[in-house]
Amino acid sequence: MNPIINLILLSSMIAGTILTMSSHHWVSAWLGLELNTLAIIPIISKTHHPRATEASTKYFLIQAASSALFLLSGITNAYSHGTWDMAHLTNTPSKIMLSVALATKLGLAPIHFWLPEVLQGTPMITALIITTWQKIAPMALLITTWNLIPPTITLIMGLLSTIIGGLGGLNQTQLRKMMAYSSIAHLGWMITITTITPSLALFNLTLYILLTTSTMLIMHLTLSKTLQNTMLIYSYSPTTASLFLLSLLSLGGLPPLSGFSPKWLILQELTTHHLTPLALLMAITALLSLMFYLRTSYISTMTIPPSTTPLKNTWRLKSNSNTSLLSSLILLSLFLLPITPLMIQ
């Protein structure tokens, strides 16, 4: 793709997200979502591969349907109460339609089927954009309208997402599909706490973006697409393999790494608000996600494939990759736990 066109598309995507985050009007929020969607579709299909074309078509159809439902929710509320302000959402059908529309855009269960298939048909960097940047605008709308959406719907969707994200990831050998189910599980934690403490959901989203970015950048750097490919990471670079291990364990929420803090705080808030059974179920489902992170960690750091090549330590060869951004992201994703109380005050 032409670099100028690529820059224009990325700028449009950023502008759409900022427009949605800063708007309180239904039409301007919808316009930002549409701008975001139309900018990412050429990026998904830029490889001209049949899988990329299929992924872009699926993404377009599901996002168009959810945007139409989002706009219908605003029209219904405006017809009933004569206002386009999102803060005055009082119509019950509009609340339900808004919940379903945002859940579809985020890829929450039970409307999650499109996310693994779309990620599998895209390059790793594009998959990273879909799982991180494309979640910001819908989550901003969800946090903006947290007190207007029925809490029962969000709690059920959150619990379903954590269960399906954990179970779905166990059966995957493709890393992009595994990260898709990881995204579904993490979004389940976010949407669950949104109805209780929106600021904690924002903190969780920030850490999720850091952890996912560092993990998927290592996958991109080492050209890993399947679990079998991760066996070569140690031969490529023992340091990278160790950091990949720590990033995965942090993504799974294992203490004392940074990924433990949002799960710990969310479980604490749920028990404080007398939702102990829900907190117990979510803690159990977190073990499912941790299982496939541990499996990937074991394969990438403790197994080396059989080879007849004399030179296995390719890390001795000089690499031309620039890893300065990756290094800073990994440091943030691993060692933010000690300053967690300062960040959530």
From Swiss-Prot:
A molecular function GO annotation: NADH dehydrogenase (ubiquinone) activity
Alphabetical UniProt keywords: Electron transport, Membrane, Mitochondrion, Mitochondrion inner membrane, NAD, Respiratory chain, Translocase, Transmembrane, Transmembrane helix, Transport, Ubiquinone
Name of one Pfam family that matches: NADH_dehy_S2_C
Catalytic activity: a ubiquinone + NADH + 5 H(+)(in) = a ubiquinol + NAD(+) + 4 H(+)(out)
E.C. designation(s): 7.1.1.2
Biological-process GO terms, alphabetical: mitochondrial electron transport, NADH to ubiquinone
CC terms in the record's Gene Ontology section: mitochondrial inner membrane
Transmembrane domains' residue ranges: 1-21, 25-45, 59-79, 96-116, 123-143, 148-168, 191-211, 240-260, 274-294, 324-344
Family from the record: Belongs to the complex I subunit 2 family.
Function: Core subunit of the mitochondrial membrane respiratory chain NADH dehydrogenase (Complex I) that is believed to belong to the minimal assembly required for catalysis. Complex I functions in the transfer of electrons from NADH to the respiratory chain. The immediate electron acceptor for the enzyme is believed to be ubiquinone.
Protein name: NADH-ubiquinone oxidoreductase chain 2
Protein's organism: Varanus timorensis
Taxonomic lineage from the root: Eukaryota, Metazoa, Chordata, Craniata, Vertebrata
Gene (UniProt): MT-ND2
